């Protein structure tokens, strides 16, 4: 198969591993910078171009779209969909998962476990917003934050109000969530591929940090999921419409609580901690599933 990865940095561990896995299976996997692609939007022969030539003849694309370029990245994926090229994760699904508020609303509608979450624009009702989230301590998150950046634990009502006012003063949108104390600064990252959990790890926050992101100095170890956790991860990926997803959960007193669903999960931490060749499982899924013209959206979403 001839495959194309949409990614800004070909040297990232995850991207190198996907190339290795593809080549080991006899496939060709090119990596081109998403931001350097451009489009010919026409009715009869839509094109994506790169350095003056048309990108054609690909059996499938593997989008690895960074959060900072979501809008343009989705447009490029959508253009390939209009050309009938199969996408590992489709543009509409990527958009759902990147919009934190929308993803929480969709997961909530599906009846999946979530931390109690409040969202408001006006700061005049901050006390009620904090009460909705169960009262202090609360976790305050930037809607656009990634890798633990823009996430604050406010342990008192006064500090919570100060943080909310500061964020709103900067004209950024935030979520206020209940603090899940029983999680103990740890979360679970699962990788779902084609409707199956292929790997799972526990991430423990660094000493004194409630955030468990490995980018923030956390540690990782292999973990055995409960049947409910496994089912929750699979259902979350399905709600988003993602063929490949990183689903982050907390272990609450009443079951798993979804924190985030990621459309471009990193592979380094989870492959190292579990020993699972996640990259190979992703390429195996592409190999078995990619069919030209099979894209569900065809660029309509």
Swiss-Prot record:
Source superkingdom = Bacteria
Q: What is its EC number?
A: 6.3.2.-
- Name the InterPro entries for this protein: ATP-grasp (IPR011761), ATP-grasp_RimK-type (IPR013651), ATP_grasp_subdomain_1 (IPR013815), RimK (IPR023533), Rimk_N (IPR041107), Rp_bS6_RimK/Lys_biosynth_LsyX (IPR004666)
Q: Where does Mg(2+) 2 bind?
A: 260, 262
* Binding-site positions, Mn(2+) 1: 248, 260
**GO CC terms of this entry:** cytoplasm
Any one GO molecular function term: ATP binding
Note on how the cofactor is bound:
Binds 2 magnesium or manganese ions per subunit.
PROSITE patterns recorded: ATP_GRASP (PS50975)
One record GO biological process: SOS response
The coenzyme or cofactor needed here is: Mg(2+); Mn(2+)
Provide the residue positions that the database annotates as binding Mn(2+) 2.
260, 262
Alphabetical keyword list: ATP-binding, Ligase, Magnesium, Manganese, Metal-binding, Nucleotide-binding, Protein biosynthesis
> Where does the ATP-grasp domain start and stop, copy by copy?
104-287
* Annotated positions binding ATP: 141, 178-179, 187, 211-213
**Residues annotated as binding Mg(2+) 1:** 248, 260
Supply the enzyme class, top level.
ligase
Name the family the entry cites.
Belongs to the RimK family.
Q: Which PANTHER family match?
A: RIBOSOMAL PROTEIN BS6--L-GLUTAMATE LIGASE, RIBOSOMAL PROTEIN S6 MODIFICATION PROTEIN
This chain belongs to the protein called: Probable alpha-L-glutamate ligase
**Species this protein is from:** Maricaulis maris (strain MCS10)
């Amino acid at each position: 198969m001839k495959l194309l990865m949409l990614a800004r940095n070909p040297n990232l561990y995850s991207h190198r591993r996907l190339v290795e896995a593809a080549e080991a299976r006899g496939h060709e996997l090119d990596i081109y910078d998403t931001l350097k692609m451009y489009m010919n939007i026409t009715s009869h022969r839509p094109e994506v171009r790169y350095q003056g030539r048309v990108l054609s003849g690909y059996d499938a694309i593997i989008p690895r779209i960074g959060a900072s370029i979501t809008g343009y990245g989705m447009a490029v994926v959508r253009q390939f969909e209009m050309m009938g090229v199969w996408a590992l994760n489709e543009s509409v699904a990527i958009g759902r998962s990147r919009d934190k508020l929308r993803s929480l609303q969709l997961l909530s509608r599906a009846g999946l476990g979530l931390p109690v979450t409040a969202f408001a624009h006006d700061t005049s009702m901050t006390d009620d917003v904090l009460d909705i989230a169960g009262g202090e301590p609360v976790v305050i998150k930037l809607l656009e934050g990634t890798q633990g950046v823009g996430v604050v634990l406010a342990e008192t009502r006064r500090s919570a109000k100060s943080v909310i006012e500061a964020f709103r003063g900067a004209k950024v949108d935030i979520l206020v969530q209940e603090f899940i104390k029983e999680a103990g600064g740890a979360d679970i990252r699962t990788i779902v591929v084609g409707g199956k959990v292929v790997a799972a790890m526990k991430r423990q926050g660094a000493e004194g940090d409630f955030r468990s992101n490995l980018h923030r100095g956390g540690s990782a170890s292999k973990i055995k999921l409960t049947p409910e956790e496994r089912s929750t991860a699979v259902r979350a990926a399905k709600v988003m419409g993602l063929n490949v997803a990183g689903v982050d959960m907390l272990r609450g007193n009443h079951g798993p609580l979804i924190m985030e669903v990621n459309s471009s999960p990193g592979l380094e931490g989870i492959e190292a901690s579990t020993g699972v060749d996640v990259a190979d499982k992703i390429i195996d899924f592409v190999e078995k599933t990619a069919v030209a013209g099979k894209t569900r959206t065809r660029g309509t979403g």
